[in-house]
Amino acid sequence: MPALRFPSRLTEGRLVRRYKRFLADVELADGRLVTAHCANPGAMLGLAAPGRPVLLSAATSPGRKLAWSWEMVEADLPGGPQWVGINTMRPNHLVAEAFREGRLPALAGVTSLRPEVRYGRASRVDFLAEHPAGPIHVEVKNCHMMRDAGLAEFPDCIAARSARHMEELAAVVRGGGRAMVIVVVQMRAGRFTVAGDVDPAFAASFRRAQEAGVATVAYRCRLDPDEVAIEAEIPMLPA
């Protein structure tokens, strides 16, 4: 499967603390203390404990305020420790790369992807996929929570914005259009489900979207310090 290679090998460190949601202090292997951007608005349950091994990417833009981004954490998950991708900006790039290489079955027949297209009630869809049978509104979700061995779950907190997206995708289908949700699981998992106990409203919206005809698919990733790769489709359990 296609891989998203980092410009340089990720840098090892240990998490000191995550704070203000989008910031993390990390002690690097050489003893330096740096502040990294945490591109994740979620609760990150079990992933933000101080002392956990983490991997950071170095900023490629010299004018960026923070020189580091937090990419992965080695978490003690059910079934054993493993690296988990926490950067919610990566899945869209992974999907786009998979499409370019023609190796993502969910997008078979798609001729082009347009990112960040406006639709619905002042929303933006992650991609508008052009297809001979008609355009497909594609929403991408990042998944990084595991509470039972092998079972990936989304969301890890109240996800009102994501619930609204589900309702708007359902409206697209009811209006004669096509829509799809691609869940990118940034860890080793064998199955995916919606965490209805975490956000019952999102779970209900997800079910309504499926019932309306929104296609849903989940892919797990392989992660290492050099790259992240979509590896395989995994079964999606009922929401």
UniProtKB/Swiss-Prot annotation:
Family statement: Belongs to the SfsA family.
Highest taxon above the source species: Bacteria
GO terms for MF: DNA binding
Matches recorded under HAMAP family: SfsA (MF_00095)
Cited InterPro entries: SfsA, SfsA_C, SfsA_N
Gene for this chain: sfsA
Lineage of origin: Bacteria, Pseudomonadati, Pseudomonadota, Alphaproteobacteria, Hyphomicrobiales
Identification of the protein by name: Sugar fermentation stimulation protein homolog
NCBIfam families given in the database record: sfsA
